[in-house]
Amino acid sequence: MPETLTDYVCTACGCLCDDHALTVEGRRITRVEPPCPVAAAFFLKERPAPPAAALIDGKPATLEAALARAAEILQAASAPLVFGCEQASVDAQRAAVALADRLGATIDPTDAAGRSQNHAALQTLGAVTSTLGEVAGRSDLIVYWNCDPAVTHPRHIERIARHPFTTPGDHPAARRVIVVAPNRNASTTLADEALTLRAGGDLAALAVVRAIVAAEKPADVKIDNEDQVERLTGAPLAQWAYLAQRLKLARYTAIFYAPDRSDPAGPNAIAQSITELVRDHHRHTRAVALTLGEPGNAPGAAQVLAWQTGFPSAVNFAAGFPQSLPGESTAATILERAEADAALIIAADPLDAATTSLSAAAQTHLRQIPAIVLDDHATSTAQQAAVAIFTPTFGIETTGEAFRCDNVVLPLQAAIPLRLPTTEELLHRLLALLN
C-alpha cells in the first residue's frame, strides 16, 4: 500500500526544501512533489543493496569483524586522517569529531571528490548574511552572481526570488531579479535582467562595482581606462554603473553566489570580494550575501567542527588539543605529502577516477595506506579499502538534523526503513573498541 510522507526535507541541493511530498511503496520512492529535477534524480534513483554488511580487503565480512579490523588499523596508526563527513547527519558528524579527538587524528570535512571547504573569507571578514526566509520576505533585489540556480537549485528562484513579500510596508509590485553570468543560461531566461560577465572576470567586475557603490556620486569614480574595464570584465563600465545604482536604490539586496571548490584561490577571493561589496553597500541600505549551498550537510560539518573545536575545517588533534592550519592540514595536502598512515573516509569517493579532485600523488598515497570507508554503496574507494562498512543512505533512510545553506537547522525524516546501522552508530561502536 503506498504511503505518503509530507513536509519532507530534501538534501539533494543546498536549498533543503522542506515542503516535499514523497510517495513510498515498499523500499522505493515512486513520486516526488512538487516537481524538481534534482530532487527526482536523488529520490527516484535505483539503489541496489550492498554486496554485504561489510568488506575486508574486498571480501564479504561480518559487521563485527569489520569493526574490529577498523579499530586495529586506527589504533596502530600514528597519524590517522578522517575526512568526508558532508553526507551525514549532525550527530554522525559529532561522532566523527569525537573519534578524531580520541585518535589524535586530523579531521577535514570534504565533498565526495575530496575537496575541502574554504572558510578564509569568513574567518577574515566575517559574514553579512540572513536566513532564506528573511530574503524571501523582505528583499526587493536579488542578484545571482555567476551561477545558474535554475539548473543547480531548481526551486531557489521559485521559493526565494519569486516569493511574495511577507513583511508590512510599501513594497514594489515585485522584487527585481538580476543574473550576472558569462553566458545566457536557464536562470537568465527567468530573471528580469541578465548582465554580461567575462569568464574569470569576477574579481575585476566586483572591484569596479564596489568602487562605484562606495562613491558618494557616480562622477566621483575615476576610471582611467574604460576599455580596460570592458576587457577585464567583459562588459562596459556603463553596465557596472547601472548595477551599482540598482544596488543603491534597493531597500534590501541579497547576493547569491556559488563558490567553486575546484579552484583553491578562486572561491576565497570571490567570497571575500562579495562580502566587501555587501559591507560597503550597508552605507546606503540593507544587503546580505549567501552561497547557494551544496548537497547534503556541508554547512553542518563546518558548524559541528567549529562548535567542538573553534575551527571549521582542517583540524589536527595530534598535540592533544585542536589546531588548524588551513592549506597545510587539509585532507588533500596531507595525502599529497604522504603524512597520513591510515584514513577513515565517511561518505566520500576520492578514488573515483571520473570525479576525484586529489592529485596523482595524493591518490597513490591513499591507495598505499589502510583505509576504512563508511558509505551507502560500493564506491571505487570502498572497493579498494582495507575495510568498507555499508551504511543507510543519508537523507532517505536516516533521521537526524542537517544545516541549510543559511545555517538554519532542519529535521530529517526517514522515507525508507533502516536495514543497516547508521553512520553515527558505527562511529560510536568504533570509538568504544579503541583502548
Language model features with spans:
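N-terminal, charge-rich interaction modules
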Residues: 7-19, 263, 292-310
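Short, well-ordered coil loops that connect the C-terminus of an alpha-helix to the N-terminus
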Residues: 76, 105, 283-287, 368
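N-terminal export/assembly segments and adjacent metallocofactor-ligating motifs
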Residues: 1-212, 259-260, 432-435
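Non-catalytic alpha/beta scaffold blocks inside enzyme catalytic domains
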Residues: 119-282, 309-435
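Short, flexible loop segments at boundaries between secondary-structure elements
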Residues: 282, 286-298, 376-378
